[in-house]
């Protein structure tokens, strides 16, 4: 059943891997699922264990350098460019609105980014200036760029946090 739910033939997991509600399932449960399992040994960086929890904390605090050190690469999000409400375009700063495949990224704010290979500025958050919106949005203004990206799958690399989101009065 699990193999059908997660659509995986193999999983790469850590020695202390747990999953499910309240982390109730472990490696032995996976072994029963006929999914090939590869177990990684613990990785340490600066005498501290590297874990997804540690990485998420670094990201949520805006420490992209620590996250990069732990991941071995810059933090990235992929998604598809979709039509937005054109507000950025109306004020001279068109944005690529990204439908994120991961709907709860551990990172929020305004960032210097690369969209594929082009530099830009991204806002990832709830857009507090736009009233009545609580869903997370990722939108990127690509510098000196005018190509049509609608429908394309893009890769956003987070380079530096500029600031938290701010609600503007006008």
Predicted regions and their residues:
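Classical nucleotidyltransferase
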Residues: 1-94, 169
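Phosphate/ribose-recognition catalytic cores of enzymes acting on nucleotide-derived substrates
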Residues: 84-170
């Amino acid at each position: 059943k699990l193999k059908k739910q997660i659509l995986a033939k193999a999983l790469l997991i850590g020695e202390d891997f747990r999953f499910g509600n309240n982390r109730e399932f472990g490696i032995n449960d996976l072994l029963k699922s006929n999914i090939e399992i590869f177990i990684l040994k613990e990785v340490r960086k600066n005498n501290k264990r590297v874990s997804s929890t540690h990485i998420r904390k670094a990201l949520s605090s805006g420490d992209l350098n620590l996250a990069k050190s732990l991941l071995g690469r810059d933090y990235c999000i992929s998604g598809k460019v979709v039509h937005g409400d054109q507000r950025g375009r109306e004020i001279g700063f068109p944005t690529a609105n990204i439908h994120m495949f991961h709907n709860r990224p551990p990172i929020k704010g305004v960032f210097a980014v690369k969209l594929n290979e082009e530099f830009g500025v991204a806002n990832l958050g709830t857009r507090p200036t736009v009233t009545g919106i609580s869903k997370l949005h990722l939108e990127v203004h690509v510098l000196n760029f005018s190509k049509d990206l609608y429908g394309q799958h893009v890769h956003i690399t987070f380079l530096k946090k500029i600031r938290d989101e701010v609600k503007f009065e006008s």
